[in-house]
Amino acid sequence: MAAQARRTITWFPGHMRKATQIIEDKLRSAEAVVEIRDARVPLSSINPSFEELVTRYDRPRVVVMNKADLVSNADKSRIIRYVEGQQNARVLFTSAKQQSKSIMNKLSKEILKETGRPKFRHGGVMALVVGMPNVGKSSIINLLRSGLRLDGGSSHRQGGGGKKRRRTNVAKTGATPGLTRHVSPIQIARDPSVFLFDTPGIMVPRIESDDVGMRLALAGIIPEKVVPAESMVPFLLEIMNNSNNLQYASALKLPSEIIETGDAELLMDTVAQNIGRGGSGARLDAARHIMAKYRKGDFGKFL
């Protein structure tokens, strides 16, 4: 079954326009950029707005490919060749499953490698953290915060008795893209000091193609209210069949007929029956079930 005709995909809420200006203002005083991308969509999650700003202000960049546990080693090698060769940026692979200390050490090492040690002993390096919504930016920030607590404290201390302030300013995370608005800078290294300043996740005013838009929707970067789950299933099925990745069939307990025909509607109806859903919302429930399994990596590692 051929993929359904797709409408033009756009998602650029008003707060993102303001956030773009915030990022540019902060970039003037930052010495480096840490860009978080989703490793499953390493090219589609490139934001041309970030590219233009990094070039204009000539800032060194470390690209953190998050959710790297969901892509193969062969794909990681291709990602490194492209990003380091075409975008002149260092690449670091990570996932929320990693130990926070490991991420802190790797990231601070890469930032210092790109910027050099600060000129003054008591100075530090400030890096701006940017990325599209829902690429795991807030999860990484919070993981780094927890790693800093385990490491024996932070710059957020009260004077006198040395008691730590209660940490209430934590980056919110969730399945809703574009949730993060603002969090304070965090320190991820000492001697020399390295600070990260988080920023809101932003999209671009115009997505270059429907293919890119659908890939971003599959990864959860564009919310379901913009691209319904039922619209994603035909696109995902086409990608998996074209890549000869049939792991989804066993994960969803599907008959061979669906693999042979590529019928997305039959796929959703079969899954709905398998998970005990019926009625008018059965296909939607099935589509959400399929997307949840894909995003967890139950269908294998592929881009």
Residue ranges: model-predicted function:
Residues R37:
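Glycine-rich, N-terminal phosphate-binding loop of Rossmann-like dinucleotide-binding domains
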